Amino acid sequence: MANIKSAKKRIKVTEKKTLRNKMIKSALKTAIKKFEVAVEANNKAEAATLYVEAARALDMSASKGVVHKNMAARKKSRLAAKLNAMA
């Protein structure tokens, strides 16, 4: 247990940021899964709109520092390839 005031504050801040990061990652995974379900169902119109949402979630999480920007770019590229392969 922390005794110093600044250490106590860091614990609180870390817990808050960890919760925020978990929330963002969870939303990101949900967006990607929704897109992949639409691709499996071969629903191109729905998949196109869900791709935009997934790409937005990836960009947002990368800009917030939750995931690495290269990881976000790689995932977006793979999702776009899946979308284009549906044609």
Curated annotation (Swiss-Prot):
InterPro entries: Ribosomal_bS20, Ribosomal_bS20_sf. GO terms for cellular component: cytosol; small ribosomal subunit. SUPFAM superfamilies: Ribosomal protein S20 (SSF46992). Signal peptide: none annotated. The keyword Coiled coil does not apply. GO terms for molecular function: small ribosomal subunit rRNA binding; structural constituent of ribosome. The keyword Ion transport does not apply. Keywords: Ribonucleoprotein, Ribosomal protein, RNA-binding, rRNA-binding. Coiled coil: none annotated. HAMAP family: Ribosomal_bS20. Belongs to the bacterial ribosomal protein bS20 family. Binds directly to 16S ribosomal RNA. This is Small ribosomal subunit protein bS20. The lineage of its organism: Bacteria, Bacillati, Bacillota, Clostridia, Eubacteriales. The gene is rpsT.
